[in-house]
């Protein structure tokens, strides 16, 4: 009996610690990008997956202690996919006492009618879903639309665009919507997926399967996701360093003439961003930028990234 109580206390301690980390990550993202302002009405897009459940939970938690007042309304789009458990989200949200709206639109039928069997349906489905959510935000008087993409999603998108699209383009934590009428925010931008997975399991959220439409997963994105997970296991800190790099861009040391006036450099021009350090031996920090070891991590020396000097 004592052993059970001991385990329960430890589980609660770990859950509290995890929730504090997620809350801190979300709070920092909100502050860094001015995501939420006084009087905002936030439309929280709830899919029934781990990410959106976590986003709603953390925003509700922050709402109680934030120095500003803002309201939340959860929105789920029932796309009439076969087997969709339409009772789960209303029951969950009513239990929490959260204002919500279930939008019923048969986008599944439209996609099946327009897209030939065997072809990818995700592109059309996304466009339809986006338009419905924008319309719903207007109807509800929402000032911001919150999506549940996290740090790993942002990095995956960056590598997808680099590997397949020839662009250095990620997924912004805050942006103006396609129709120019709504501000979209991603409060989980600084949150690690593995933290969200653990939090969702500990909270026992009623997860709704994401493959009800029968579509295949994005294989290219899956390859990138597997690559990042492998790096995270083999080289602790690499993911954090890459995300830090997205926040420390030096246009003068890249090749985009739209971001920096290379043609304007002439004799007498001032040195920009340290000039050319290509021939200098660069000091590699022992601890990867942006990485904070967990309490149960082994020694920092053992976890140091492998550094290969290119000559």
UniProtKB/Swiss-Prot annotation:
It is found in: Cytoplasm. CDD domains: TtcA-like. One of its GO terms (molecular function) is ATP binding. It comes from the Bacteria. Its cofactor is Mg(2+); [4Fe-4S] cluster. It catalyses: cytidine(32) in tRNA + S-sulfanyl-L-cysteinyl-[cysteine desulfurase] + AH2 + ATP = 2-thiocytidine(32) in tRNA + L-cysteinyl-[cysteine desulfurase] + A + AMP + diphosphate + H(+). [4Fe-4S] cluster binds at residues 122, 125, 213. GO terms for cellular component: cytoplasm. Its EC number is 2.8.1.-. GO terms for biological process: tRNA thio-modification. Keywords: 4Fe-4S, ATP-binding, Cytoplasm, Iron, Iron-sulfur, Magnesium, Metal-binding, Nucleotide-binding, RNA-binding, Transferase, tRNA processing, tRNA-binding. A motif (PP-loop motif) lies at residues 47-52. InterPro entries: Rossmann-like_a/b/a_fold (IPR014729), TilS/TtcA_N (IPR011063), tRNA_Cyd_32_2_STrfase (IPR012089), tRNA_thiolation_TtcA_Ctu1 (IPR035107). Pathway: tRNA modification. The thiolation reaction likely consists of two steps: a first activation step by ATP to form an adenylated intermediate of the target base of tRNA, and a second nucleophilic substitution step of the sulfur (S) atom supplied by the hydrosulfide attached to the Fe-S cluster. Homodimer. Catalyzes the ATP-dependent 2-thiolation of cytidine in position 32 of tRNA, to form 2-thiocytidine (s(2)C32). The sulfur atoms are provided by the cysteine/cysteine desulfurase (IscS) system. Belongs to the TtcA family. This is tRNA-cytidine(32) 2-sulfurtransferase. It comes from Salmonella heidelberg (strain SL476). The gene is ttcA.
